């Protein structure tokens, strides 16, 4: 009985940490979407290379995690010795991190394209499609069971998104004319004047690379004209698949085997090493990027918003890593839906986003299907995520372990021998 006395306090502490982590993620995610939009110029294009934002944010995360990792490994000599003794198995385990790094690289790059064609509110609403992709990949990759109510809510969600898509008429030409943000965006640079003088003949060579030909896309997508499908809609569906795959694979390798007890900063150092590598290769391999960096430097075209975007993107990536390590993908998806509400509200107030009557009728269907999905989650798959959370938190923060009924009793009994607990998991 005495061993259970502290559990209510630990449960409150765990709930506080969970709430704080969710609030941080929502704030950073909302800020990131708004900063991407604010960092564009009057033509809704980017005067800087978007890849430079991703390179710098990955570098910020790598430096931060590497410094913390060195401090952690210094305190744990046995892990330090293990790292010195390399083997092929450890090398292949290290190379595993290249897969989510590449997927995150694609995900971060597509965001710039999406927000060139869609309002932030519409982009976030359509990104709810990630619930479907996450659920499917949960079932296939993580073998997670979904009950009938959850599948029904996913079907309602999908149909609501299709209806929402067919009922919106957002013109990409009108995007640059919203609000008052254009005048304060661009900070002209004094460098590379010669390079800039050649750009007008090439139709703004910096910004041109980051938009698609509208005429070419319209002829390609004419078959979808009856549902008013645009390039932004297709891109965001692709982004949902890529983002879901990245997060699920990342959660899998964060928690599988002995990775569960490894420091999250050591794990993230491996991930961000490949993130810097992939984004850096993109800068070097594209001739347009190479010429601009050679003549103007890597920070040409950046403004206050894009610089802030670098750090917000970095810390948002860190918050996602903490969610996947200590919670799970479904919590991440749920917090993304709260971000939807925040971005929609801000778009109405700042970007002069004026929802139609159809929007007000169909958007609640999206949010209600999300609510039904998450409300049915404890009834259908309670045991699996609960066990994962307990396993995950018990590997690092033993005092934050939580559970209900027999499950908690079973986990707290062998508390005198923590290592045997790990072996059974």
Curated annotation (Swiss-Prot):
Provide the glycosylation site positions. Answer: 204, 218
This protein's name: UDP-sugar transporter protein SLC35A5
Q: List the catalysed reactions.
A: UMP(out) + UDP-alpha-D-glucuronate(in) = UMP(in) + UDP-alpha-D-glucuronate(out); UMP(out) + UDP-N-acetyl-alpha-D-glucosamine(in) = UMP(in) + UDP-N-acetyl-alpha-D-glucosamine(out); UDP-N-acetyl-alpha-D-galactosamine(in) + UMP(out) = UDP-N-acetyl-alpha-D-galactosamine(out) + UMP(in)
Assembly and partners are described as: Probably forms homooligomers and heterooligomers with SLC35A1, SLC35A2, SLC35A3 and SLC35A4.
**Organism domain of life:** Eukaryota
User: Which BP terms from GO are recorded?
Assistant: transmembrane transport
In Gene Ontology terms, what is one molecular function of this protein?
A: transmembrane transporter activity
InterPro entries referenced in this protein's UniProt entry, alphabetically: Nuc_sug_transpt (IPR007271)
Q: Name one GO cellular component term.
A: Golgi membrane
Organism source for this protein? Bos taurus
User: Main localization of the protein?
Assistant: Golgi
The residues on the Cytoplasmic side of the membrane are: 1-7, 74-92, 143-147, 250-263, 325-330, 376-425
SUPFAM superfamilies in UniProt: Multidrug resistance efflux transporter EmrE (SSF103481)
Q: State the membrane topology.
A: Multi-pass membrane protein
Q: What is the primary gene name for this protein?
A: SLC35A5
Keyword Transport assigned to the entry: answer is yes
Keywords of this entry: Antiport, Glycoprotein, Golgi apparatus, Membrane, Phosphoprotein, Sugar transport, Transmembrane, Transmembrane helix, Transport
For this UniProt entry, which residues form the secretion signal?
Answer: none
> What spans are recorded as compositionally biased (Basic and acidic residues)?
408-418
Keyword Transmembrane helix applies: yes
Q: Extract the ranges annotated as region (Disordered).
A: 398-425
Family per UniProt? Belongs to the nucleotide-sugar transporter family. SLC35A subfamily.
The compartments listed are: Golgi apparatus membrane
Which parts of the sequence lie on the Lumenal side of the lipid bilayer? 29-52, 116-119, 169-228, 285-303, 352-354
Q: Which residues carry this modification: Phosphoserine?
A: 394, 416, 420
What is the recorded function of this protein according to its Swiss-Prot or TrEMBL entry?
Probable UDP-sugar:UMP transmembrane antiporter involved in UDP-alpha-D-glucuronate/UDP-GlcA, UDP-GlcNAc/UDP-N-acetyl-alpha-D-glucosamine and UDP-N-acetyl-alpha-D-galactosamine/UDP-GalNAc transport from the cytosol to the lumen of the Golgi.
TM regions (residue ranges): 8-28, 53-73, 93-115, 120-142, 148-168, 229-249, 264-284, 304-324, 331-351, 355-375
């Amino acid at each position: 009985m005495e061993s259970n006395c502290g559990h209510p306090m630990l449960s409150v502490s765990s709930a506080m940490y969970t709430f704080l982590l969710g609030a941080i993620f929502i704030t950073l995610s909302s800020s990131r979407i708004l900063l991407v939009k604010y960092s564009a110029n009057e033509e809704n294009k980017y005067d800087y290379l978007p890849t430079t934002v991703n390179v710098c944010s990955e570098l910020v995360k790598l430096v931060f995690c590497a410094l913390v990792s060195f401090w952690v490994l210094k305190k744990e000599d046995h892990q330090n010795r293990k790292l010195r003794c390399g083997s092929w198995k450890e090398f292949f385990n290290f190379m595993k991190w290249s897969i989510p790094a590449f997927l995150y690289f694609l995900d971060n790059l597509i965001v710039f394209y999406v927000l060139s064609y869609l309002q932030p509110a519409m982009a976030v609403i359509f990104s709810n499609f990630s619930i479907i992709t996450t659920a499917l990949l949960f079932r296939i990759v993580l073998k997670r069971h979904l009950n009938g109510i959850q599948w029904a809510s996913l079907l309602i969600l999908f149909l609501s998104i299709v209806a929402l898509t067919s009922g919106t008429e957002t013109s990409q030409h009108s995007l640059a004319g919203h609000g008052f943000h254009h005048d304060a965006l661009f900070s002209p640079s004094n460098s590379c004047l010669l390079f800039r003088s050649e750009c007008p003949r090439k139709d703004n060579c910096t910004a041109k690379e980051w938009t698609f030909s509208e005429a070419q896309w319209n002829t390609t997508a004419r078959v979808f004209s009856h549902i008013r499908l645009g390039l932004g809609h297709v891109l965001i569906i692709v982004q949902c698949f890529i983002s879901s795959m990245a997060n699920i694979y990342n959660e899998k390798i964060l928690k599988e085997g002995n990775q569960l007890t490894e420091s999250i900063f050591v794990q993230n150092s491996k991930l961000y090493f490949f993130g810097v590598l992939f984004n850096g290769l993109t800068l070097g391999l594209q001739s347009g990027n190479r010429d601009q960096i050679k003549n103007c430097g890597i920070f040409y075209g950046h403004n206050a918003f894009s610089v802030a975007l670098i750090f917000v993107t970095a810390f948002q990536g860190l918050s996602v890593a903490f969610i996947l390590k200590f919670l799970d993908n479904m919590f991440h998806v749920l917090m993304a839906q709260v971000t939807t509400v925040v971005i929609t509200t801000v778009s109405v107030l700042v970007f002069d986003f004026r929802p139609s009557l159809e929007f007000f009728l169909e958007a609640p269907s999206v949010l209600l299907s999300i609510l039904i999905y998450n409300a049915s989650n404890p009834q259908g798959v309670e045991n699996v995520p609960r066990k994962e959370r307990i396993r995950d938190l018990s590997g690092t923060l033993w005092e934050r372990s939580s559970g209900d009924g027999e499950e908690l009793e079973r986990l707290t009994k062998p508390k005198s021998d923590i290592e045997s607990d790990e072996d059974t998991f």
